[in-house]
Amino acid sequence: MTYNIVALPGDGIGPEILNGSLSLLEIISNKYNFNYQIEHHEFGGASIDTFGEPLTEKTLNACKRADAILLGAIGGPKWTDPNNRPEQGLLKLRKSLNLFANIRPTTVVKGASSLSPLKEERVEGTDLVIVRELTSGIYFGEPRHFNNHEALDSLTYTREEIERIVHVAFKLAASRRGKLTSVDKENVLASSKLWRKVVNEVSQLYPEVTVNHLLVDACSMHLITNPKQFDVIVCENLFGDILSDEASVIPGSLGLSPSASFSNDGPRLYEPIHGSAPDIAGKNVANPFGMILSLAMCLRESLNQPDAADELEQHIYNMIEHGQTTADLGGKLNTTDIFEILSQKLNH
């Protein structure tokens, strides 16, 4: 079997971190004996510059045919038209591929707890995943309107939309430490009342998973005061957007965090959580670990290569533990150095 991968380098530092990661993929495929082919497509601001829109039909169709999609980063101050922004291409891609589940791991690597803005003893051993519903909720709700006197947004969830994201979270929790925290605002929101009801019903199908409920404001506090207590957190779109960004600073750098977006049966999208960082683009100083860890997620989830994913992650964790990092993590290496060291480790 030959896996079909679509590469979307995007904007800013996206091309350099993605292209370097693809060089690692070539080494890994030879080592673990699997085949793949890459289709490169412009996306985001780069696509606006070339084609006048952030996501062309050609690119979208290629993504629909793919086994996996790897995205570098998009956006930047260059693209200011509110009706034609790079981010609109990503929203359209998620919706078109029905990428309803966003998976965001947060791991504090051994030896790197000093990088966290929190006390070391508070974050050591943190290993959690936030499962965020991605295609419904207040970001997509209708009706919505805005004028100088009034603005309206609509927060709507159906039972089916809640059930499918909750099943993803339960299955993930069952494969990890067996603990699921469901986040809502059940004390004031009707949508959260339905959310909690559905979570309790679905929990009957997963007796091996312990479930607890937290209001979103309480969860935001516990993420700071005791992040180690969490295993898997599941939440609706807006809450997940906020909480996953909060959790991402716990390890000390946005550059350490990967993410994946899943549908039930279509291609999955893998990308680092950081932005395009146009101020450092082309300077060979970008931290590529988030992109490489996203590649590891792709190896495990879409390319059926769990051993390769484990090896790649362990090499990264060992590098971080021994201070072999870029400047944002306190090290002295540049982007190329990171890829060269990992290439040597993988070839060993």
From Swiss-Prot:
GO terms under biological process: L-leucine biosynthetic process
SMART domains: Iso_dh (SM01329)
GO cellular component, as recorded: cytosol
Residues that hold substrate according to the record: 94, 104, 132, 217
Chief location of this protein within or outside the cell: cytoplasm
EC number: 1.1.1.85
GO molecular function: 3-isopropylmalate dehydrogenase activity; magnesium ion binding; NAD binding
Cofactor(s) the protein needs: Mg(2+); Mn(2+)
Binding site residues for Mg(2+): 217, 241, 245
Residues that bind NAD(+): 76-87, 275-287
Lipid metabolism recorded as keyword: no
UniProt-listed InterPro entries: IsoCit/isopropylmalate_DH_CS, IsoPropMal-DH-like_dom, Isopropylmalate_DH
Catalytic activity of the protein: (2R,3S)-3-isopropylmalate + NAD(+) = 4-methyl-2-oxopentanoate + CO2 + NADH
Keyword line: Amino-acid biosynthesis, Branched-chain amino acid biosynthesis, Cytoplasm, Leucine biosynthesis, Magnesium, Manganese, Metal-binding, NAD, Oxidoreductase
Pathway(s) it belongs to: Amino-acid biosynthesis; L-leucine biosynthesis; L-leucine from 3-methyl-2-oxobutanoate: step 3/4
PROSITE patterns tied to this protein: IDH_IMDH
Keyword DNA damage: no
Site residues by UniProt (Important for catalysis): 139, 185
Source species, domain of life: Bacteria
Subcellular location: Cytoplasm
Family of the protein in this entry: Belongs to the isocitrate and isopropylmalate dehydrogenases family. LeuB type 1 subfamily.
Function statement: Catalyzes the oxidation of 3-carboxy-2-hydroxy-4-methylpentanoate (3-isopropylmalate) to 3-carboxy-4-methyl-2-oxopentanoate. The product decarboxylates to 4-methyl-2 oxopentanoate.
NCBIfam families: leuB
Protein name: 3-isopropylmalate dehydrogenase
Primary gene name: leuB
